[in-house]
Amino acid sequence: MPVAVEDIMRLLCSISEERKMKAAVKHSGRGALVTGAVAFVGGLVGGPPGLAVGGAVGGLLGAWMTSGQFKPVPQIIMELPPAEQQKLFNEATAIIRHLEWTDAVQLTMLVMGSEALQKQLLAMLANYVTKELRAEVQYDD
């Protein structure tokens, strides 16, 4: 039976949802820009003391902006372009190639019954999110 990309994406969504996996892309460039801009304006308005105050306020504002907004990994998976889904598909099928299944429901049941397979797929998914999407992964308990 040909393996469908959609089936594998559903499987990865199920596993990551079960573990409450979230990811956040940090916007460090935007935070640095805000920090510098506020420090610059503070320096123009208040001279050296204004620069110090502007730098402190800008730094706090920049830090707040870069504390990423977490999105559920299943949502991220489903929003990936087809080429990225294909990458995930290729990596996941290498892990589950020995399983025999007929549809996404059966595949999910087989994987959910194996802690070892779940760990391998979660590690692969966390690695993908961290390296390819440059995001921070978090698990809610």
From Swiss-Prot:
Keywords: Cytoplasm, Endoplasmic reticulum, Membrane, Mitochondrion, Transmembrane, Transmembrane helix
One GO CC annotation: mitochondrial membrane
Record flagged with keyword Mitochondrion: yes
The keyword Cytoplasm appears for this protein: yes
Record-linked InterPro entries: C19orf12
Annotated localization: Mitochondrion; Mitochondrion membrane; Endoplasmic reticulum; Cytoplasm, Cytosol
Bilayer topology term: Single-pass membrane protein
Membrane-crossing residue ranges in chain numbering: 37-57
Family under the similarity heading: Belongs to the C19orf12 family.
Name of protein: Protein C19orf12 homolog
